[in-house]
UniProtKB/Swiss-Prot annotation:
The gene is sfsA. It comes from Carboxydothermus hydrogenoformans (strain ATCC BAA-161 / DSM 6008 / Z-2901). Gene3D superfamilies: 2.40.50.580, 3.40.1350.60. It holds the Pfam family SfsA_N. It comes from the Bacteria. This is Sugar fermentation stimulation protein homolog. GO terms for molecular function: DNA binding. The lineage of its organism: Bacteria, Bacillati, Bacillota, Clostridia, Thermoanaerobacterales. InterPro entries: SfsA, SfsA_C, SfsA_N. Belongs to the SfsA family.
Amino acid sequence: MEFNFTPIPAVFCKKLNRFVGEVVLQGEKVLVHIPNSGRLAEILTEGRLVYLREGKNPGRKYQYDLVLAQMPESLVLVDSLLPNKIAQGLLEKGIIKPFSREIDQVAAEQTKGQSRFDFKVQLRDKTGFIEVKSVTLVEGKYALFPDAPTPRGVRHLEELRALSSQYLTAVVFLICREDAEVFKPNDKCDPYFASALKKAAMAGVYIKAYRLKLDLKGVYFDREMEVVL
């Protein structure tokens, strides 16, 4: 996916809260929106080179979104809204298994009963529901999710597990950086999520991880990654 904007370099100073940070842009301190609910403690550190996207709405509170951060071995996609757009493209191209067979329709933000899922996929002979999670934390060779406790993520897994006997269900982890080789749940951070993920897999929910490639022009599919539960 090519960016429809030109990333603007800045230097990160500090987070004011979960969604607001301070950067130095062209010699001036500026407040920016951080479109990611994670802690990002290992990524958004003082002095980190980051890249911004200028907003098109003149009435918005913060003029810029913090989209990318430069780690020693890789750029990191901080914007957690973009991975769903990337996932939709991968689904439509038949890259994400087990949805690689003939797809009639991919619909975003769909409800099933009381549950809301990132995607509903209509295959010729079956319906599928998918949740997408963006992964930014890496320790050694491992990409880890989550980087903060996520009761909402646990609920998503329980909902998918409940549907798995009647529908194709999957959790897709998009690794938003290039310096990881294996995905596993972050059981130290959120043992409830790790346990729910294992139970979902045992019930037949597909657990998939795909690594992305990044540069200042866009984000691209790299390869499927090993998942260790």
